């Protein structure tokens, strides 16, 4: 079906009399193209809006999920019709392909479209129809996303690859420690980077055949991780990254890994957030809510957004909260939360500091001329009160312990 036939079909539907309106042939109408993508084939639905508000499916077809397949199928369609498809593995190259064909693209966020994710009749054809229908009804209902530039996507790919190697190295180290404990041997090395430097002569013979092949692979993993670190550092020197990375690293605890992964995750566009604090929800570092009346449950964080970015920020938070770290407003916030006590107080403190780090970085990137003050006067006073309270609590614990010891001796 060529473009002339498709346009004729749309014109014919528009010119039909409608039971609720007078016959009109000059009314404008909208046409959208919904595409539901799978690895091998994609479903295409062209939908037009008629004068009475009715939506008519004009064309439904299938094409191969390849550049050639899309070029052949979309050569029949008018370039003024927007192409709507979901985020996913193929969305980046598809967006580039459609733009090269001079189509406007709308990349939908399926996680925020209940009519697709929670449909009882979910299939590829219906998904393509729903995308086209929502594009006509209200494009904002598609929750459009802006894809990152290639250089930021490249940085994220480097971080994903590095993160995979780091997790594999950690699994190997834990497995070797488990082998050692099973034969009554304890490995003293505390760092994963130097774990492979263990002396073979000091190891029990029962572990040689099992553990040493893993130890050799650890050395290879370390070399690969260092290679990725160098690639990340090199890419961070590019103009798109350099100024923002230097700006982010003025905050204690933020290194090359934490700064680059956050900048890449937000696509180098800090102004996408109306308020800097919005980045906390974007990265899933805010708690879920379930409140009704007087009941307000304490829930876990949402874990939305990028896992590797969230993990990197939590690791940076651990550095910022170390005892030898300088006193900052961010550190004070974490120490206050940790002082509350309880099983999860320290974890909550890390998450809160991670969120504060992300918010502070975005605020600095939104205004590159703003001066960063690590510790304000209010923060200085806060640390004085914190140390006084900590000393008081320490004395209380010591008094309770002494009282318990006296009671035990008397018994």
PLM features: residue spans?
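Intrinsically disordered, low-complexity and often Lys/Arg-enriched segments
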Residues: 1-30, 52-56, 60, 381-382, ...
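Glycine-rich, often acidic, oxyanion-interacting loops/wings at catalytic, nucleic-acid
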Residues: 2, 160-247, 381
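Gly/Thr-rich phosphate-binding beta-strand-loop-beta motif of the actin/hexokinase/Hsp70
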Residues: 28-49, 131, 165
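Short alpha-helix plus adjacent loop in nuclease-associated cores
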Residues: 106-144, 198-199, 295-304
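Short, charge-rich amphipathic alpha-helices with coiled-coil/heptad character
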Residues: 138-156
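Phosphate-backbone recognition surface of nucleic-acid-processing proteins
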Residues: 246, 250, 256-342, 346
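Low-complexity, acidic/Ser/Thr- and charged residue-rich accessory regions of DNA metabolism proteins
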Residues: 294, 335-411
């Amino acid at each position: 079906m060529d473009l002339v036939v498709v346009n004729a079909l749309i014109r014919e539907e528009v010119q039909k009399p409608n039971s609720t309106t007078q016959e009109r042939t000059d009314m404008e109408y909208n046409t959208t193209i919904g595409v539901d993508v799978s690895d091998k084939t994609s479903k295409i639905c062209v939908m037009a809006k008629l004068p009475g508000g009715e939506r008519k499916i004009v064309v439904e077809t299938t094409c191969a999920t390849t550049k050639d397949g899309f070029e052949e199928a979309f050569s029949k369609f008018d370039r003024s019709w927007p192409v709507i498809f979901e985020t996913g593995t193929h969305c980046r190259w598809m967006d580039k392909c459609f733009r090269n064909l001079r189509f406007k693209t709308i990349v939908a966020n399926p996680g925020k479209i209940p009519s697709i994710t929670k449909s009882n009749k979910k299939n590829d054809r219906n998904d393509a129809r729903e995308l086209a229908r929502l594009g006509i009804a209200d494009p904002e209902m598609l929750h459009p996303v802006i894809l990152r530039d290639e250089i930021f996507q490249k940085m994220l790919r480097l971080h994903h690859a590095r993160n995979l190697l780091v997790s594999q190295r950690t699994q190997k180290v834990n497995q070797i420690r488990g082998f050692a404990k099973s034969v009554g041997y304890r490995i003293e090395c505390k760092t994963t980077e130097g774990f492979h430097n263990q002396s073979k002569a000091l190891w029990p013979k029962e572990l040689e055949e099992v553990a040493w092949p893993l130890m050799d692979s650890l050395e290879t993993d370390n070399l690969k991780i260092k290679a990725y670190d160098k690639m990340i550092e090199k890419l961070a020197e590019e103009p798109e990254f350099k100024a923002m990375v230097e700006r982010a690293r003025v905050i204690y605890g933020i290194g090359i890994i934490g700064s680059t992964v956050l900048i890449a995750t937000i696509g180098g566009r800090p102004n996408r957030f109306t308020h800097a604090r919005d980045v906390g929800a974007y990265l899933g570092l805010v708690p879920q809510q379930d409140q009704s009346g007087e009941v307000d449950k304490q829930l876990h964080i949402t874990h939305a957004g990028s896992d590797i970015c969230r993990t990197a920020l939590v690791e940076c938070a651990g550095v910022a909260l170390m005892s030898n770290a300088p006193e900052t407003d961010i550190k004070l916030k974490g120490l206050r939360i940790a002082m509350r006590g309880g099983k999860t107080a320290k974890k909550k403190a890390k998450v809160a500091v991670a969120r504060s780090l992300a918010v502070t970085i975005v605020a600095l990137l939104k205004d590159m001329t703003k001066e960063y003050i690590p510790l304000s006067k209010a923060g200085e006073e806060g640390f004085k009160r914190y140390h006084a309270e900590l000393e008081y609590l320490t004395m209380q614990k010591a008094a309770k312990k002494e009282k318990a010891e006296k009671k035990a001796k008397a018994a």
